[in-house]
């Protein structure tokens, strides 16, 4: 907060791009159902030790130092994030707008699926379901338990799950009736493009998502995404046209979405819809033009 204020004191137009809710709360990156940030973060329900529950109020009050700077502008990547700003006690009055994340649509693009699988040493004749999480299956925001239950309700000798992340716990997937492959952490865009092209469906069971960068990466490669209807995901997925939006935390609907995506994985019309959508909304050209329009309005 101190560093942000030191920049604001320069008096120049200052933009903060909100990747999560941290700026709006007493410390939470995602508030989920908690609405305390609407008025005052105090007695945080996520802090178990009574002796330190005051911390969130202290952090929240500390952020009040920022709210009256007229040169502060907030940019949200989705309508959901913008709505959170509008409801926040701290920054509801601050100038704000929605500009989505951008994507290198030249780098992330379709390539031959067989070639991609051969290069990654993945099976050629199996339906592959990709799940990605920054901390493998251990990140609570990524909803692995829900996806695990959805996959547990599926069966088929011709299916396999591919997990992208830091690690995969063998015990957590041992009950599945199909094979699994751990890709570990992949950070370069070339390898990610190969992986998206190698699979048949990309599933995000995320319970907190300000945007959904991996979703547009998959779409740009022609791979159908499946995700819950929450956060910034509805800004990206148009139900059954550019992916599948499952009802929030609905395991059965998530399973149905995966099966729908698998059955439409070679649908050229859907692939075209996805690629066109990414190009028209998230390409470098489109997004940078939005930033420049905003800059020209206030400079």
Q: At which residue positions do the language-model features occur?
A:
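Conserved donor-binding/catalytic core segment of Leloir-type glycosyltransferases
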Residues: 123-142, 148-151
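Aromatic "clamp/platform" in nucleotide-sugar-dependent glycosyltransferases that forms part
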Residues: 207
């Amino acid at each position: 907060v101190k560093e942000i204020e030191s920049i604001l004191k320069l008096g120049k137009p200052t933009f903060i791009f909100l990747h999560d809710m941290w700026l709006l709360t007493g410390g939470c990156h995602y508030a989920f159902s908690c609405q305390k940030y609407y008025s005052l973060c105090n007695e945080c329900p996520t802090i178990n030790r009574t002796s330190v529950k005051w911390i969130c109020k202290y952090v929240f009050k500390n952020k009040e130092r920022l709210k009256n700077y007229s040169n502060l502008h907030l940019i949200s990547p989705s309508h959901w994030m913008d709505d959170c700003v509008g409801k926040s006690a701290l920054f509801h009055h601050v100038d704000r707008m929605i500009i989505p994340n951008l994507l290198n649509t030249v780098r992330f693009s379709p390539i031959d699926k067989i070639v991609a699988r051969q290069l990654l040493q993945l099976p050629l004749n199996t339906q592959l379901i990709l799940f990605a999480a920054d901390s493998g299956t251990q990140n609570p925001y990524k909803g692995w338990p829900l996806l695990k239950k959805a996959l547990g309700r599926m069966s088929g000798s011709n299916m396999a799950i591919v997990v992208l992340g830091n690690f995969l716990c063998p015990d957590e997937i041992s009950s599945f009736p199909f094979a699994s492959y751990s890709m570990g952490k992949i950070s370069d865009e070339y390898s990610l493009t190969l992986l998206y092209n190698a699979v048949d469906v990309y599933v995000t069971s995320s319970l907190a998502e300000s945007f959904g960068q991996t979703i547009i990466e998959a779409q740009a490669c022609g791979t159908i995404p499946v995700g819950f209807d929450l956060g910034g995901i509805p800004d990206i997925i148009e139900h059954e046209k550019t992916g599948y939006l499952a009802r929030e935390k609905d395991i059965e609907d998530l399973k149905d979405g995966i099966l729908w995506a698998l059955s439409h994985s070679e649908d050229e019309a859907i692939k075209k819809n996805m690629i066109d959508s990414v190009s028209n909304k998230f390409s470098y050209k489109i997004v940078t033009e939005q930033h420049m329009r905003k800059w020209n309005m206030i400079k």
